[in-house]
Regions:
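Residue-level detector of alpha-helical secondary structure
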Residues: 3, 7-11, 66-69, 73, ...
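Acidic, low-complexity, intrinsically disordered interaction modules
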Residues: 17-76
Length: 84
């Protein structure tokens, strides 16, 4: 299986969101505003930085960050198998 096929499979099964090209949990996906912007805290989470900011839902955000981090790590590990 080529890397492209693997990525296509992940996209098809909803494990990677096109904009981010990374595994994600649909329940943790950032809320999108009408103008297409996202909460900064989610941007920080998805950029692989620790969640910075304290607001309602911190526990959920941290859980989502951990999920995305763990999934991304697993994805990268899997991806390395297909890298030349």
């Amino acid at each position: 299986m080529k890397l492209e096929d693997y990525k296509a499979w992940l996209l098809e099964h909803g494990e990677i969101k096109k904009e981010y090209e990374r595994p994600y949990n649909p329940q943790c996906d950032p809320p999108e505003y009408k103008d297409g912007s996202y909460f900064l805290s989610y941007d920080l989470m998805y950029a692989g930085r620790p969640y910075a900011g304290f607001a309602v839902g911190d526990v959920t955000a941290l859980a989502c960050y951990k999920y995305v981090y763990d999934e991304s790590k697993a994805y990268l590990k899997e991806r390395l198998k297909y890298e030349v």
